[in-house]
């Protein structure tokens, strides 16, 4: 496959879900083999140029996995999502999600952003099912114009997988003074709800001051976990419950402005730390502030008899721009 080109447009058109914008006869006559439409969205925010940017590529059935990865690297966002024809009859689209480092079975802000993009082109609030490698995700979407809100039910409930890296190594990797990372009830652990992260608690000031040390990061043994979520209770009056930062340079994401999949696993870490009793929870997680891209992620879940019964992740998304991705064979 040859070069990839991305062409922007001044207006954001409304597209049919999973539809290639160039029909087969046009492709046969053109030296450009394929032309696909894309939109960019800022997710977990209701205003442009905040939250986590996302590229949504429509009609991606014609793309190989290698082409998807190359396009993702061209956009150079934390993630891009590709919409394909679903295999399951009850699903409106099938999603493939890529970071610059490779494909993920699930991620939060691409799921929210894809649902918002589909609902916007349909011009109506909707309930839909999206097909991902990590399962079928039921999503409720509401909004109008360019601003939408989506919340998905995660079929993968939070769980603790293993203990985390040594606190001293985490402190070195995140540029924190010795003693910053909690080592008792909030000791580092590997948790996940679809994909795994390592979770580490620190005082709020330390979370805000963390700076990635790539040399020390390379000494961490993260296996196939996607990154480290550093967390603390949010400041009073912030309107949030938790203040977090997610670092994942080994997957091509030095720091992520908003990580719905990491927020989804946070309840498992809090339960293992003795923080959760039975009941219904409705959290707001703030992220991206240190990057100048403030984001808010809603995490709703229920605990019964010490077990997670449900989990939903939600947030706003706003359309930013649109255009075409073109490449020649």
What name fits each language-model region?
Residues 7, 23, 27-106, 112-329:
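Active-site proximal loop and beta-alpha junction motif in alpha/beta enzyme cores
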């Amino acid at each position: 496959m040859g070069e990839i080109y991305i062409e922007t447009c001044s207006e954001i058109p409304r597209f049919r879900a999973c539809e290639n914008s160039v029909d087969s006869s046009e492709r046969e006559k053109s030296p450009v083999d394929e032309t696909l439409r894309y939109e960019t969205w800022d997710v977990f925010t209701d205003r442009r140029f905040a939250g986590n940017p996302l590229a949504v590529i429509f009609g991606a059935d014609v793309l190989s996995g290698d082409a998807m990865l190359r396009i993702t690297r061209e956009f150079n966002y934390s993630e891009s999502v590709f919409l394909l024809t679903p295999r399951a009859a009850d699903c409106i689209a099938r999603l493939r999600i890529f970071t610059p480092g490779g494909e993920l079975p699930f991620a939060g802000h691409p799921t929210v952003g894809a649902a918002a993009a589909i609902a916007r082109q349909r011009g109506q609030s909707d309930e839909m099912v999206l097909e991902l490698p990590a399962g079928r995700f039921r999503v409720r979407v509401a909004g109008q114009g360019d601003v939408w809100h989506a919340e998905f039910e995660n079929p993968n409930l939070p769980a603790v997988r293993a203990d985390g890296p040594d606190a001293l190594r985490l402190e070195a990797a995140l540029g924190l003074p010795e003693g910053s990372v909690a080592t008792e009830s909030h000791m580092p652990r590997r948790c996940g709800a679809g994909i795994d992260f390592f979770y580490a608690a620190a005082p709020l000031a330390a979370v805000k001051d963390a700076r990635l040390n790539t040399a020390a990061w390379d000494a961490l043994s993260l296996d196939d976990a996607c990154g480290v979520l550093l967390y603390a209770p949010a400041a009073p009056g912030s309107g949030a419950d938790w203040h977090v930062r997610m670092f994942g340079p080994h997957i091509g994401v030095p720091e992520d402005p908003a990580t719905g999949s990491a927020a989804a696993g946070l309840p498992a870490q809090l339960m293992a730390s003795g923080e959760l009793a039975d009941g219904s929870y409705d959290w707001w997680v703030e992220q991206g502030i240190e990057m100048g891209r403030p984001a808010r992620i809603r995490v709703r879940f229920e605990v019964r008899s010490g077990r997670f019964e449900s989990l939903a992740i939600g947030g706003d998304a706003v359309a930013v721009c649109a255009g075409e991705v073109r490449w020649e064979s």
